[in-house]
Regions:
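Conserved AdoMet/S-adenosylmethionine-binding subsite of the radical SAM
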Residues: 1-154, 158
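Radical SAM enzyme core and accessory elements
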Residues: 157, 167-185
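A structural preference for short, hydrophobic beta-strand core positions in alpha/beta folds
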Residues: 127, 164-166
Length: 185
């Protein structure tokens, strides 16, 4: 979680943006987070043009807490309240990352719930197909491309911008979410 080391992350971003660093555009930088409200607000205030991606992956606290234990500390409702404040500090929308698992969080009712949760919020949804790996056992399964497209259509029909992350490197266990050692650590 990069925001657990916020001071270093901020300084690194400033170097990447500077003329003595990489001279990147702020919109070329995305910081992904599990959702640490205080740190999200601090980052938004100090660097309002960079992209922030909130890893959500569920539409209710019960499921999100099972998938992401951090949710027991910061609920979905708290994160949405944080997003409301961030909108007053930031120049652009926050990305909501949503890793899709077959039969777990991919039901069309979940798409409708996302629409309800984020009504009137400035967000972009990034749907991420699950990439399994033989190195790490998982109870999760891959969603069909059709299911992801149907899910996407429901969110788009509510007026949100939605992307589906392209997956590369799956053939060598190097796609998003697949990086692990042979020991599974």
């Amino acid at each position: 979680e990069p925001l657990r080391n916020l001071a270093v992350v901020k300084e690194s971003i400033k170097v990447m943006l500077s003329s003595y660093g990489f001279h990147l555009s702020p919109t070329a930088i995305t910081v992904s987070t599990l959702g640490l409200p205080k740190e999200m607000l601090s980052l938004s205030k100090e660097l309002p043009e960079i992209q922030i991606a909130l890893s959500l992956h569920a539409v209710n606290d019960e499921l999100r807490s099972k998938m992401m234990p951090i949710n027991t500390k910061y609920s979905i409702a708290q994160l949405i309240e944080t997003l409301k404040v961030m909108e007053t500090l930031r120049k652009g929308p926050v990305m909501i990352s949503y890793l899709m698992f077959k039969g777990v969080n991919d039901h069309l009712e979940h798409a409708e719930a996302l629409n309800t949760l984020f009504v009137e919020r400035k967000v972009i949804f990034n749907l991420i197909p699950f990439n399994p790996t033989e190195l790490v056992s998982s109870e999760y399964q891959v969603c069909s491309r059709d299911q992801i497209q149907n899910f996407k259509a429901i969110i788009e029909n509510a007026g949100f911008r939605v992307t589906v992350r392209a997956s590369f490197g799956g053939d060598i266990d190097a796609a998003c979410g697949q990086l692990a050692s042979i020991s599974g650590k």
